[in-house]
Amino acid sequence: MSHADQLARTHLAPDPADLSRLVAGTHHDPHGILGAHEYGDHTVIRAFRPHATEVAALVGGDRFAMQHIESGLFAVALPFTNLIDYRLQITYPDSEPYVVADAYRFLPTLGEVDLHLFGEGRHERLWEVLGAHPRSFTTADGVVTGVSFAVWAPNAKGISLIGEFNGWTGTEAPMRVLGSSGVWELFWPDFPIGGLYKFKVHGADGVVTERADPMAFATEVPPHTASRVTLSSYTWGDADWMTQRAARNPVFEPMSTYEVHLGSWRPGLSYRQLARELTDYVVEHGFTHVELLPVAEHPFAGSWGYQVTSYYAPTSRFGTPDEFRALVDALHQAGIGVIVDWVPAHFPKDAWALGRFDGTPLYEHSDPKRGEQLDWGTYVFDFGRREVRNFLVANALYWLQEFHIDGLRVDAVASMLYLDYSRPEGGWTPNIYGGRENLEAVQFLQEMNATAHKSAPGIVTIAEESTSWPGVTRPTNLGGLGFSMKWNMGWMHDTLDYISRDPIYRSYHHHEMTFSMLYAFSENYVLPLSHDEVVHGKGTLWGRMPGNNHVKAAGLRSLLAYQWAHPGKQLLFMGQEFGQRAEWSEERGLDWWQLDEQGFSNGILRLVRDINDIYRSHPALWSQDTVPDGYSWIDANDSANNVLSFLRYGKDGSVMACVFNFAGAEHSGYRLGLPSAGRWREVLNTDATVYNGSGIGNMGGVDATEDPWHGRPASAVLVLPPTSALWLEPK
């Protein structure tokens, strides 16, 4: 019998077309060729090990040498059927033989229900089925440990697993596609936790690329781009916080947020070190929350995290995912909430990441007029595709559930809502009704918000939305987008425009400080003095203030007091709490040295600590942020004196009078209408000497008499220091 006849009779060699696709890396079902297969009265085991010199099958106590067929395919015919278990003994050049379970004898690690839910865009725990998952199986010959890999790439011609385990060659670990789901899967025995990997994708366009796992839970430290297998062993200590969170509604709670870029707050700190130092700092200065610029992995540090390539992996720059958990845990145990910036609007075009993942527009929209963001040179997600929407919604839940994140600040919402956002005429495609609204993005945001609030009660979602889109914070069941809050960009622009003017010109722009109250209760607002205001040549808050250093410091103190008194939650970017004078750069740390001087920075920082303490302890400043009952003008029209005054009311009946003198001169004998006679205590005076102010004030309080003024039944005569804020409460 010829050799060819023997191969044909024993089925050692597969169909030539199958073998050709296997060798080329484009076979959709390598498990149909490799592994153990019965043919009549015998069983054929095939293994594809192109770099091996020898392969044998170990069955019970017997060793069966496998024959090299061609191109790295080894096979052996066993003279029996009903094979229960076996191992492969593999020898590579210049190495000892090693024994391993055969990857191609295991059933799929994804079930039909998982695939169905994903296909429908409804798998809320997608991270539990896609990506890399350490697993163990009990077999007749013992326990087999390894890692299962699953990736969605419906148009790929073939996908292979590559990594350190196979020298990054894309041949010996081909994956199988599961039915019509587009999901490719493989369980690889003995793959180590901590091991690096990528997917070698044969794209529909004929291009072969090496891709990071879209669902990677850990990565190499940039600029390296491989994904890393990880398994959490973290034990949380924030049970009390999580229980309390579920019972709260952040809209009706104090929220004073410190916005942080982890890499430049104090450069060189790890997640573990930040857990100590950042937590201590935030607690000491009275903030209730931190908001972290995006922590999902991103290759380009200069993007500040806003060009994400691994949506499910905390950046490895500062440590492991469990060490990031430790940072969140430490903040929670100290009573600090954690918000992260989340970027579902767009993603970068890096050839190893999400873009054209399977050789077609997969995560991005196929229409370039919808699928590319020209300003940023990025791709835009296809929000109408069920699997893409599932990828993003599940990602939001992943951060909330796996990392106990308390809120998501969604970046660039306006770019998602409008099809013509920053596009020239003729450069965009209208919706089915001929309009400019991105209906698919609206549906995605509604789904994300509704699902997030259902799955994680007490969390907050915040929109960075710069237009007048109606109902951003209206519940989804009432037709809104369903966010908890949105950034008040109008307040920010008007306030900074006003405060940057010389006081002698401010009276002509008084309306800039009153206009925000015309819409203050139309949405649930956050008042942001964010990172966007201290970059790209904008300088700093300190630098915007007119005058000499004394006047600048007074201006910044009054601005911060105005922000905290205005209806809405507060957000302040790092460095502005002590009046950093240099524009922020991600390439260097904050100018902490300013606090070592006997200058104005210490006073500004002391003020922030005090206003946070006052704010948290006075419900008048936060419990009715979103309703007109929480606010009343005393005098909105004193433009001649550059004075604004209003009352804040708490649900508990408390009241706070807030007076702001934005003139460069003192106003003595200033009569202010008040709701009741009696002693009014000066809770805050931003010109106090403890803040390095001039010390002008009212000796700690004033006596209001029953003399009507400003439409109020009582009034008091005040001294208003130049460029200052006073907060008063009835004693």
From Swiss-Prot:
InterPro entries: A-amylase/branching_C, Branching_enzy, GlgB, GlgB_N, GlgB_N_E_set_prok, Glyco_hydro_13_cat_dom, Glyco_hydro_13_N, Glyco_hydro_b. It comes from the Bacteria. Pfam families: Alpha-amylase, Alpha-amylase_C, CBM_48, GlgB_N. SMART domains: Aamy. CDD domains: AmyAc_Glg_BE (cd11322), E_set_GBE_prok_N (cd02855). Keywords: Carbohydrate metabolism, Glycogen biosynthesis, Glycogen metabolism, Glycosyltransferase, Transferase. The active site is at 411 (nucleophile), 464 (proton donor). Pathway: Glycan biosynthesis; glycogen biosynthesis. It catalyses: Transfers a segment of a (1->4)-alpha-D-glucan chain to a primary hydroxy group in a similar glucan chain. One of its GO terms (molecular function) is hydrolase activity, hydrolyzing O-glycosyl compounds. GO terms for biological process: glycogen biosynthetic process. It is an enzyme of class 2 (transferase). SUPFAM superfamilies: (Trans)glycosidases, E set domains, Glycosyl hydrolase domain. Its EC number is 2.4.1.18. GO terms for cellular component: cytosol. Monomer. HAMAP family: GlgB. Belongs to the glycosyl hydrolase 13 family. GlgB subfamily. Catalyzes the formation of the alpha-1,6-glucosidic linkages in glycogen by scission of a 1,4-alpha-linked oligosaccharide from growing alpha-1,4-glucan chains and the subsequent attachment of the oligosaccharide to the alpha-1,6 position. This is 1,4-alpha-glucan branching enzyme GlgB. The gene is glgB.
